[in-house]
A protein has these predicted regions:
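A generic structural signal for ordered secondary structure
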Residues: 9, 28, 51, 97-105
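A solvent-exposed, acidic/Ser-Thr-rich amphipathic alpha-helical stretch
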Residues: 21-25, 29-75
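A beta-strand edge to alpha-helix "cap/lid" segment located at domain peripheries
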Residues: 4, 56-157
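Glycine-centered flexibility sites
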Residues: 19, 44, 101-103
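Short, low-complexity N-terminal intrinsically disordered segments enriched in polar/charged residues
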Residues: 1-30, 136, 145-157
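Aromatic side chains
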Residues: 12, 28, 34, 39, ...
Length: 157
């Protein structure tokens, strides 16, 4: 029996909060992709589980991720989200970090084939107190990725 999109979202956010890479990655197809705005793309269940346990939970704790107003048509799903965590980065250890965005889900056979965020990254960069030159590098990588997307071709004239 396939899960509903709402059930996928509930399991997704609970697994993130618990740091349960196996449960999280099981929501994805074998060749699934998690495209994180900061950590980049992770391909396949093993890499996705490692991203959650080895990146998210290395750099943060006490995660809360809530999804709102989900919509889907069986092949594509969207949900607005609010996300927060206590930062473990040494220069701001313990600081509560807040994010706001939309999750974009490509679905196949009741599983996530591709997940990516459309997040308000400016506010996040400010909260993380990323130094100026590093900010330029981080945002530059985001821009490079955006401009490499063929969907932007007509806009690059």
């Amino acid at each position: 029996m396939q899960r509903s999109f709402t059930e996928i979202l509930d399991t997704f956010t609970a697994a993130v909060a618990a740091g349960n890479g196996a449960k999280f990655s099981a929501l994805f197809t074998e060749d699934g992709v998690y495209d994180d705005v900061f950590y980049g793309e992770y391909h396949g269940r093993e890499a996705i589980a490692q991203m959650l346990e080895g990146r998210f939970h290395r750099d943060g704790e006490n995660f809360i991720w809530r999804m709102f107003n989900p919509v889907d048509n069986g092949a594509t799903g969207y949900a607005r989200w609010l996300f927060s965590y206590d930062c473990k980065l040494p220069h701001i250890k313990g600081k509560r970090i807040f994010m706001d965005g939309v999750g974009l889900f490509a679905l196949r056979d009741g599983l996530i084939f591709r997940y990516e965020d459309a997040a308000r990254t400016g506010e996040l960069i400010a909260q993380l107190e990323i130094p100026g030159k590093k900010q330029t590098r981080v945002v530059g990588k985001m821009l490079d990725k955006q401009m490499a997307n063929p969907d932007w071709a007509e806009h690059r004239k």
